[in-house]
Amino acid sequence: MKTKHLRLMQRVYIILFFCFMYLPIAYMIVFSFNQSKGYSLFTGFTFKWYRSLFTNASILHALWVSVEVAVLSAIIATVLGTAASLGIASMSRKSRLLVTNITYIPVVNPEIITGISLMLLFVAYQRFAAQSAWLPDNIMGLPTLLIAHIAFNVPYVIFNVSPKLKQLDIKLYEAALDLGCDPRQAFFKVILPEISPAILSAFLICLTYSIDDFMISYFNCGTVETLPIAIYSMTRKKVSPEIYALSTIMFVVILCIILVSNAMESRSYRRDQKTLRKEGAR
């Protein structure tokens, strides 16, 4: 009897938890199709707020900036983070532990501190560059935004790729070298295919965080507006149904990216387990 009550309480708790988490999002999605501008009564179904959204030049420009920065920063951060992971994996145990702990700092650091510190760095650079004849001094805007996004994305790549490198059997790499491959060929033919799911997953995570970021972008964007900053500017005046439509689109896109990333990780895990079972059977 107690077991049944416990199970019932667990189910009720789970239902309440998910309602608390996702009912506001569901409410927003429903009212993005509301015919009226009000958000207390649903008067009819319409796509006019979505049509209005895609004719808004400032929103489209902010969307383009966000996509451009997200894709570029994700690509660069993935390359840098993967290279860093390979370097960390080749270190001694103490050095690897030290570097890993240092890498944790940007992740656990509050975003407002990261944003302000990067802004101060760029301001200091501009003052130094103003006294130099060969350094560009007017970098506030897209360049600083891109650098800031790369800076906070690299640790996520390292934390995603490093565990996969730990699972990698180094004997495969050594066997490739013994069979006549040079280090570059052994990397591209042995190591890269093994860690490619983690690399792609890290890229998608960087893409998600970059599109969603507000705090760090706000302090380092200069005169450039990303999509979260544009939404914030719109909400300061009045909450329009266009914001509901835009937020719905962002939610769906980010949800799709997360689902793809999780599916890839799950597929990689199943493949690793299958390989381990085959090796155990031998």
Regions found by a protein language model. Give the residues of each.
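Transmembrane alpha-helices
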Residues: 13, 18-25, 151, 157-164, ...
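Membrane-interfacial helix termini and adjacent extracytoplasmic/periplasmic loops
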Residues: 38-40, 47, 112-150, 184, ...
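Short membrane-interfacial helix/loop motifs at transmembrane-helix boundaries
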Residues: 23-57, 121, 220-222, 275, ...
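C-terminal transmembrane helix and the adjacent membrane-cytosol boundary/short C-terminal tail
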Residues: 2-12, 162-177, 187-189, 244-282
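Interhelical loop and adjacent transmembrane-helix boundary motif
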Residues: 2-7, 50-58, 211-268
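Non-cytoplasmic
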Residues: 26-37, 157, 198-232
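Transmembrane-helix boundary motif in ABC transporter permease subunits
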Residues: 1-7, 72-103, 116, 120-124, ...
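Membrane-embedded alpha-helices of multi-pass transport/permease systems
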Residues: 23-26, 30, 79-83, 116, ...
